Amino acid sequence: MADKGLEDVPEGQIESNYDETTDSFDAMNLKAELLRGVYAYGFERPSAIQQRAIMPVIKGHDVIAQAQSGTGKTATFSISTLQKIDSNVKACQALILAPTRELAQQIQKVVVAIGDFMDVACHACIGGTSVRDDMKALQDGPQVVVGTPGRVHDMIQRRVLKTDHMKMFVLDEADEMLSRGFTEQIYDIFQLLPQSTQVVLLSATMPQDVLEVTTKFMRDPVRILVKKDELTLEGIKQFYIAVEKEDWKLDTLSDLYETVTITQAVIFCNTRRKVDWLTDKLTARDFTVSAMHGDMDQAQRDVIMKEFRSGSSRVLIATDLLARGIDVQQVSLVINYDLPANRENYIHRIGRGGRFGRKGVAINFVTADDVRMMREIEQFYSTQIEEMPMNVADLI
């Protein structure tokens, strides 16, 4: 059961022992209603970790994936989980643990959204909520349960969360969970699961305590390392424009259009409604733009992406859902009309401006309310976002 390949791990980094990739969702043999959910969610093609990790999980291997936040790892295990569960069996078949309530709820939303066309229930089992409500929800036998270690452990001990149909156990952000002192509860949960349960572990770092979990509880795991440098801010000039009020962003954008010759740009907004609103406003001012968000069906989105890739449409306005699917070489400029609601998405939005070794420019519209988020982003990525200079046109 112990895995020999992990004894001498350099500086908390695992070595990949699996290099097969599947570069389209269509090639993964997913259930039709799951594939429909994947596309409806806004994915176009799998990210690096999705190309590598979804298939070994579906095939039933224990999998260790070392990947940073924001690489698409939540969807990696959500898609694999949904593929493996039997929707006719009303019992928990997959248990997903996360270090915080917020992350658990976020994962639940992703599972529910991607599983939208499947008859599958997913319950979030987290502290700070009513134990009675939890017990009631678990008695209905949701096929997927996602939760924090304390509450999940409690529910298994009360025999409300039954483990006899459990096929899969996912630990997300394992390093975080162990550093928060959940080690004992996690070990206890392992002991209460059927011996045959498949284990999938995701972690940004591989400290000793995480390696111990992998050697104790995983059988001959597939190891996948998605290096940090697959997403980088290097070569991307990042600026901000201070905008006094939200209402002034539109004029700021129009002014920018006047100063800068845009070969191709993506403008990100935080909501679908804002995308539609901005598209209407810019069209009314005679700017040619296309828009794309998760409310559109796949066929519509394909047409828009094709136009954008071919260059017949030069400006694309989109939501975060699509940040991961836009892979366009010519994008020289990314504008965050809204700063992303979570900092992990920042690199997904602007990292693409500099892909394929191209240089790019990112411009963030920042109101007084956004300053804190901008500082957080700077800290998180150890980067600097400077005030936009007058000669910005020369940089693009």
Swiss-Prot record:
Coiled coil: none annotated. ATP binds at A67, Q68, S69, G70, T71, G72, K73, T74. Its EC number is 3.6.4.13. PROSITE patterns: DEAD_ATP_HELICASE, HELICASE_ATP_BIND_1, HELICASE_CTER, Q_MOTIF. It catalyses: ATP + H2O = ADP + phosphate + H(+). GO terms for biological process: cytoplasmic translational initiation. Pfam families: DEAD, Helicase_C. Component of the eIF4F complex, which composition varies with external and internal environmental conditions. It is composed of at least eIF4A, eIF4E and eIF4G. This is ATP-dependent RNA helicase eIF4A. It comes from Phaeosphaeria nodorum (strain SN15 / ATCC MYA-4574 / FGSC 10173). The gene is TIF1.
